Protein backbone atom coordinates (compact mmCIF):
# COMPACT_ATOMS: atom_id res chain seq x y z
CA UNK A 1 0.00 0.00 0.00
CA UNK A 2 1.32 3.43 -0.93
CA UNK A 3 1.40 5.85 2.00
CA UNK A 4 -0.35 9.19 1.51
CA UNK A 5 2.88 11.09 2.17
CA UNK A 6 5.06 9.10 -0.24
CA UNK A 7 2.48 9.50 -3.00
CA UNK A 8 2.88 13.30 -3.02
CA UNK A 9 5.34 14.46 -5.71
CA UNK A 10 8.52 16.08 -4.42
CA UNK A 11 7.65 19.31 -6.16
CA UNK A 12 4.47 19.46 -4.09
CA UNK A 13 6.53 19.15 -0.90
CA UNK A 14 8.72 22.05 -2.03
CA UNK A 15 5.74 24.23 -2.86
CA UNK A 16 4.39 24.18 0.68
CA UNK A 17 4.60 27.62 2.30
CA UNK A 18 7.29 27.91 4.93
CA UNK A 19 5.92 27.90 8.47
CA UNK A 20 6.10 31.30 10.14
CA UNK A 21 4.77 32.72 13.42
CA UNK A 22 3.42 35.72 11.48
CA UNK A 23 0.43 36.24 9.24
CA UNK A 24 1.60 38.34 6.28
CA UNK A 25 -0.92 40.75 4.81
CA UNK A 26 -0.83 43.07 1.83
CA UNK A 27 -1.97 46.66 2.18
CA UNK A 28 -5.29 45.82 0.50
CA UNK A 29 -5.88 42.78 2.72
CA UNK A 30 -5.14 44.77 5.85
CA UNK A 31 -7.27 47.73 4.79
CA UNK A 32 -10.31 45.47 4.34
CA UNK A 33 -10.13 44.54 8.03
CA UNK A 34 -11.31 47.94 9.18
CA UNK A 35 -14.86 46.88 8.17
CA UNK A 36 -17.27 49.73 8.99
CA UNK A 37 -15.10 51.49 11.56
CA UNK A 38 -15.67 55.25 11.07
CA UNK A 39 -12.70 57.56 10.58
CA UNK A 40 -12.76 60.01 13.52
CA UNK A 41 -10.01 62.34 12.22
CA UNK A 42 -10.11 64.99 9.51
CA UNK A 43 -7.31 66.17 7.21
CA UNK A 44 -6.37 69.08 9.49
CA UNK A 45 -6.01 66.80 12.52
CA UNK A 46 -3.87 64.33 10.54
CA UNK A 47 -1.62 67.18 9.40
CA UNK A 48 -1.02 68.23 13.01
CA UNK A 49 -0.07 64.66 13.95
CA UNK A 50 2.27 64.15 11.01
CA UNK A 51 5.99 64.23 11.73
CA UNK A 52 8.38 66.47 9.79
CA UNK A 53 9.14 64.74 6.48
CA UNK A 54 6.60 61.99 7.05
CA UNK A 55 4.14 61.52 4.18
CA UNK A 56 0.74 60.65 5.55
CA UNK A 57 -2.81 61.53 4.55
CA UNK A 58 -6.38 60.47 5.25
CA UNK A 59 -6.09 57.49 2.90
CA UNK A 60 -3.08 56.17 4.83
CA UNK A 61 -4.89 56.66 8.13
CA UNK A 62 -8.03 54.97 6.80
CA UNK A 63 -6.20 52.04 5.18
CA UNK A 64 -3.54 51.32 7.82
CA UNK A 65 -4.11 52.94 11.20
CA UNK A 66 -7.88 52.68 11.43
CA UNK A 67 -7.76 48.86 11.12
CA UNK A 68 -4.94 48.83 13.69
CA UNK A 69 -7.04 50.87 16.13
CA UNK A 70 -9.87 48.37 15.64
CA UNK A 71 -7.51 45.45 16.33
CA UNK A 72 -6.16 47.12 19.45
CA UNK A 73 -9.68 47.86 20.67
CA UNK A 74 -10.42 44.14 20.36
CA UNK A 75 -7.20 43.30 22.24
CA UNK A 76 -8.12 45.67 25.06
CA UNK A 77 -11.55 44.05 25.33
CA UNK A 78 -10.04 40.56 25.31
CA UNK A 79 -7.59 41.56 28.04
CA UNK A 80 -10.48 42.82 30.16
CA UNK A 81 -12.15 39.43 29.61
CA UNK A 82 -9.02 37.61 30.80
CA UNK A 83 -8.91 39.83 33.87
CA UNK A 84 -12.52 38.89 34.62
CA UNK A 85 -11.65 35.21 34.27
CA UNK A 86 -8.75 35.63 36.69
CA UNK A 87 -10.98 37.41 39.18
CA UNK A 88 -13.47 34.55 38.96
CA UNK A 89 -10.66 32.11 39.66
CA UNK A 90 -9.30 34.12 42.61
CA UNK A 91 -12.72 34.56 44.17
CA UNK A 92 -12.40 35.70 47.77
CA UNK A 93 -8.61 35.35 47.67
CA UNK A 94 -8.38 38.68 45.91
CA UNK A 95 -9.25 40.36 42.63
CA UNK A 96 -7.53 42.59 40.13
CA UNK A 97 -8.69 46.08 39.30
CA UNK A 98 -8.05 47.24 35.76
CA UNK A 99 -4.51 48.26 34.86
CA UNK A 100 -3.46 50.18 31.74
CA UNK A 101 -3.06 48.35 28.44
CA UNK A 102 0.53 49.09 27.34
CA UNK A 103 1.62 49.37 23.70
CA UNK A 104 5.24 49.65 22.55
CA UNK A 105 6.16 51.36 19.25
CA UNK A 106 9.72 50.76 17.99
CA UNK A 107 11.77 51.55 14.90
CA UNK A 108 14.70 53.53 13.55
CA UNK A 109 15.36 57.24 13.73
CA UNK A 110 13.39 58.98 10.91
CA UNK A 111 11.25 55.92 10.06
CA UNK A 112 8.07 57.64 11.27
CA UNK A 113 7.44 55.80 14.54
CA UNK A 114 6.56 59.03 16.37
CA UNK A 115 3.82 59.75 13.84
CA UNK A 116 2.52 56.19 14.23
CA UNK A 117 2.42 56.61 18.01
CA UNK A 118 0.61 59.96 17.81
CA UNK A 119 -1.94 58.58 15.33
CA UNK A 120 -2.63 55.59 17.57
CA UNK A 121 -3.09 57.89 20.55
CA UNK A 122 -5.59 60.03 18.63
CA UNK A 123 -7.52 57.08 17.16
CA UNK A 124 -7.63 54.94 20.30
CA UNK A 125 -8.84 57.85 22.43
CA UNK A 126 -11.95 58.11 20.21
CA UNK A 127 -13.13 54.63 21.23
CA UNK A 128 -15.61 54.96 24.13
CA UNK A 129 -14.12 51.95 25.96
CA UNK A 130 -10.73 53.65 26.50
CA UNK A 131 -10.80 57.45 26.12
CA UNK A 132 -7.73 58.15 28.28
CA UNK A 133 -4.67 57.35 26.16
CA UNK A 134 -1.23 58.63 27.18
CA UNK A 135 1.90 58.73 25.03
CA UNK A 136 5.41 58.69 26.50
CA UNK A 137 8.64 58.68 24.48
CA UNK A 138 11.81 57.10 25.78
CA UNK A 139 13.74 60.32 25.04
CA UNK A 140 12.93 61.46 28.57
CA UNK A 141 14.99 58.56 29.89
CA UNK A 142 18.16 59.46 28.00
CA UNK A 143 21.01 60.26 30.36
CA UNK A 144 21.59 64.03 30.72
CA UNK A 145 24.21 65.49 28.38
CA UNK A 146 26.69 66.11 31.21
CA UNK A 147 26.52 62.47 32.21
CA UNK A 148 26.82 61.27 28.60
CA UNK A 149 29.91 63.45 28.18
CA UNK A 150 31.41 62.19 31.45
CA UNK A 151 30.94 58.59 30.31
CA UNK A 152 32.18 59.28 26.77
CA UNK A 153 28.78 58.36 25.31
CA UNK A 154 27.78 61.47 23.33
CA UNK A 155 28.59 59.67 20.08
CA UNK A 156 26.46 56.75 21.30
CA UNK A 157 23.35 58.80 22.05
CA UNK A 158 20.34 56.66 21.18
CA UNK A 159 22.20 53.39 21.78
CA UNK A 160 20.83 51.24 24.62
CA UNK A 161 23.62 52.25 27.02
CA UNK A 162 22.73 55.96 26.69
CA UNK A 163 19.41 55.45 28.52
CA UNK A 164 18.56 55.00 32.17
CA UNK A 165 16.98 51.65 31.36
CA UNK A 166 16.27 50.79 34.96
CA UNK A 167 14.29 54.03 35.49
CA UNK A 168 12.37 53.50 32.23
CA UNK A 169 11.42 49.94 33.15
CA UNK A 170 10.44 51.02 36.66
CA UNK A 171 8.27 53.81 35.20
CA UNK A 172 6.27 51.40 33.03
CA UNK A 173 6.15 48.79 35.81
CA UNK A 174 4.63 51.37 38.18
CA UNK A 175 1.98 52.27 35.61
CA UNK A 176 1.25 48.61 34.94
CA UNK A 177 0.97 48.06 38.69
CA UNK A 178 -1.89 50.57 38.77
CA UNK A 179 -0.22 53.42 40.66
CA UNK A 180 -2.37 56.55 40.71
CA UNK A 181 0.39 58.88 39.56
CA UNK A 182 3.76 58.22 37.91
CA UNK A 183 6.25 60.84 36.67
CA UNK A 184 8.89 60.83 33.94
CA UNK A 185 11.67 63.28 32.96
CA UNK A 186 11.07 65.63 30.02
CA UNK A 187 13.43 65.80 27.02
CA UNK A 188 13.81 68.82 24.72
CA UNK A 189 14.90 68.36 21.11
CA UNK A 190 15.59 72.10 21.04
CA UNK A 191 18.34 71.96 23.67
CA UNK A 192 19.13 68.29 22.94
CA UNK A 193 18.98 67.45 26.63
CA UNK A 194 16.78 66.62 29.61
CA UNK A 195 14.93 69.72 30.85
CA UNK A 196 15.97 70.36 34.49
CA UNK A 197 13.09 70.38 36.95
CA UNK A 198 10.38 69.41 34.45
CA UNK A 199 8.32 66.23 34.82
CA UNK A 200 5.62 64.51 32.80
CA UNK A 201 2.86 63.12 35.01
CA UNK A 202 0.80 60.09 33.97
CA UNK A 203 -2.38 59.37 35.94
CA UNK A 204 -3.90 55.92 35.46
CA UNK A 205 -4.60 55.96 31.72
CA UNK A 206 -6.72 53.34 29.99
CA UNK A 207 -3.91 52.85 27.48
CA UNK A 208 -0.23 53.83 27.62
CA UNK A 209 1.83 54.05 24.41
CA UNK A 210 5.62 53.88 24.86
CA UNK A 211 7.54 55.00 21.77
CA UNK A 212 11.29 54.74 21.22
CA UNK A 213 14.22 53.20 19.41
CA UNK A 214 14.96 50.43 21.86
CA UNK A 215 11.65 49.61 23.53
CA UNK A 216 11.80 45.99 22.34
CA UNK A 217 15.31 45.37 23.66
CA UNK A 218 15.53 42.30 25.90
CA UNK A 219 16.64 42.81 29.48
CA UNK A 220 20.34 42.65 30.26
CA UNK A 221 21.40 39.95 32.72
CA UNK A 222 22.30 41.18 36.19
CA UNK A 223 25.81 41.05 37.64
CA UNK A 224 24.79 37.83 39.34
CA UNK A 225 23.89 36.34 35.95
CA UNK A 226 20.17 36.28 36.66
CA UNK A 227 17.73 37.34 33.97
CA UNK A 228 15.97 40.61 34.73
CA UNK A 229 12.55 41.84 33.73
CA UNK A 230 12.76 43.99 30.60
CA UNK A 231 10.63 46.89 29.42
CA UNK A 232 8.94 44.82 26.70
CA UNK A 233 7.82 42.28 29.30
CA UNK A 234 5.19 44.84 30.35
CA UNK A 235 3.80 45.34 26.84
CA UNK A 236 0.38 43.97 25.93
CA UNK A 237 1.03 44.72 22.25
CA UNK A 238 3.96 46.05 20.25
CA UNK A 239 4.52 47.57 16.81
CA UNK A 240 7.78 47.73 14.85
CA UNK A 241 7.91 50.29 12.02
CA UNK A 242 10.19 48.86 9.33
CA UNK A 243 11.81 50.15 6.12
CA UNK A 244 14.98 49.63 4.10
CA UNK A 245 18.01 51.42 5.59
CA UNK A 246 18.66 53.30 2.34
CA UNK A 247 15.12 54.69 2.38
CA UNK A 248 15.44 55.70 6.05
CA UNK A 249 18.72 57.48 5.29
CA UNK A 250 17.04 59.51 2.55
CA UNK A 251 14.16 60.41 4.90
CA UNK A 252 16.67 61.34 7.61
CA UNK A 253 18.54 63.72 5.29
CA UNK A 254 15.31 65.28 4.02
CA UNK A 255 14.19 65.85 7.61
CA UNK A 256 17.56 67.39 8.47
CA UNK A 257 17.18 69.85 5.57
CA UNK A 258 13.75 70.91 6.80
CA UNK A 259 14.92 71.23 10.41
CA UNK A 260 17.87 73.34 9.27
CA UNK A 261 15.40 75.75 7.65
CA UNK A 262 13.05 75.81 10.65
CA UNK A 263 13.77 74.60 14.21
CA UNK A 264 17.57 74.92 13.92
CA UNK A 265 17.12 78.67 13.28
CA UNK A 266 16.05 79.15 16.90
CA UNK A 267 18.91 80.85 18.81
CA UNK A 268 18.44 78.30 21.62
CA UNK A 269 18.78 75.30 19.29
CA UNK A 270 21.64 72.92 20.02
CA UNK A 271 22.04 72.53 16.23
CA UNK A 272 22.00 76.22 15.32
CA UNK A 273 25.63 76.03 14.22
CA UNK A 274 24.51 74.00 11.18
CA UNK A 275 22.54 76.98 9.92
CA UNK A 276 25.73 79.07 9.88
CA UNK A 277 27.62 76.85 7.43
CA UNK A 278 26.83 75.96 3.83
CA UNK A 279 24.11 73.42 3.10
CA UNK A 280 26.71 71.02 1.68
CA UNK A 281 28.75 71.18 4.90
CA UNK A 282 25.65 70.68 7.03
CA UNK A 283 24.54 67.69 4.96
CA UNK A 284 28.02 66.17 5.17
CA UNK A 285 27.62 66.26 8.95
CA UNK A 286 24.16 64.68 8.69
CA UNK A 287 25.42 61.88 6.42
CA UNK A 288 28.31 61.17 8.77
CA UNK A 289 25.94 61.10 11.75
CA UNK A 290 23.65 58.68 9.95
CA UNK A 291 26.39 56.30 8.83
CA UNK A 292 28.48 56.28 12.02
CA UNK A 293 25.71 56.50 14.64
CA UNK A 294 22.11 56.03 13.52
CA UNK A 295 22.68 53.32 10.91
CA UNK A 296 25.02 51.42 13.21
CA UNK A 297 22.45 51.57 16.01
CA UNK A 298 19.72 50.45 13.63
CA UNK A 299 21.64 47.42 12.38
CA UNK A 300 23.17 46.40 15.72
CA UNK A 301 20.39 47.13 18.19
CA UNK A 302 17.07 48.25 16.71
CA UNK A 303 16.45 45.97 13.70
CA UNK A 304 17.34 42.76 15.61
CA UNK A 305 14.35 43.41 17.91
CA UNK A 306 11.88 43.39 14.99
CA UNK A 307 11.03 39.73 15.56
CA UNK A 308 9.85 40.54 19.09
CA UNK A 309 7.01 42.76 17.83
CA UNK A 310 3.38 41.66 17.65
CA UNK A 311 2.98 43.66 14.42
CA UNK A 312 5.61 44.67 11.86
CA UNK A 313 4.56 47.58 9.62
CA UNK A 314 6.69 47.71 6.44
CA UNK A 315 7.02 50.99 4.58
CA UNK A 316 8.01 51.48 0.96
CA UNK A 317 10.31 54.19 -0.49
CA UNK A 318 7.44 56.73 -0.48
CA UNK A 319 6.76 56.32 3.28
CA UNK A 320 3.53 54.45 2.48
CA UNK A 321 2.89 51.15 4.24
CA UNK A 322 3.10 48.24 1.79
CA UNK A 323 2.84 45.11 3.92
CA UNK A 324 2.12 44.11 7.51
CA UNK A 325 3.05 41.01 9.50
CA UNK A 326 0.83 40.13 12.46
CA UNK A 327 2.05 37.60 14.99
CA UNK A 328 -0.22 34.58 15.31
CA UNK A 329 -1.74 33.69 18.67
Curated annotation (Swiss-Prot):
Superkingdom in the source lineage: Bacteria
Name of the protein this chain belongs to: Pantothenate kinase
Organism: Streptomyces avermitilis (strain ATCC 31267 / DSM 46492 / JCM 5070 / NBRC 14893 / NCIMB 12804 / NRRL 8165 / MA-4680)
Principal subcellular localization: cytoplasm
InterPro entries: P-loop_NTPase, PanK, PRK/URK
HAMAP family membership: Pantothen_kinase_1
Short name of one Pfam family: PRK
Broad EC category: transferase
Amino acid sequence: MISPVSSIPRSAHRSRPEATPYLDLTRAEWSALREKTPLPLNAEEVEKLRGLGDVIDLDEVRDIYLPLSRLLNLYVGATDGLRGALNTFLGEQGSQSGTPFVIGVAGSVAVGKSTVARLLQALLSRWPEHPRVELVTTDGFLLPTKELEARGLMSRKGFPESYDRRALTRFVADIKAGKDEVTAPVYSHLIYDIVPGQKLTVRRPDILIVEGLNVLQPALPGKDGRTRVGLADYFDFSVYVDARPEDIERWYLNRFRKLRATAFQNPSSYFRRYTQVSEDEALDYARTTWRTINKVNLLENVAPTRGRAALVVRKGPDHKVQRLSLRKL
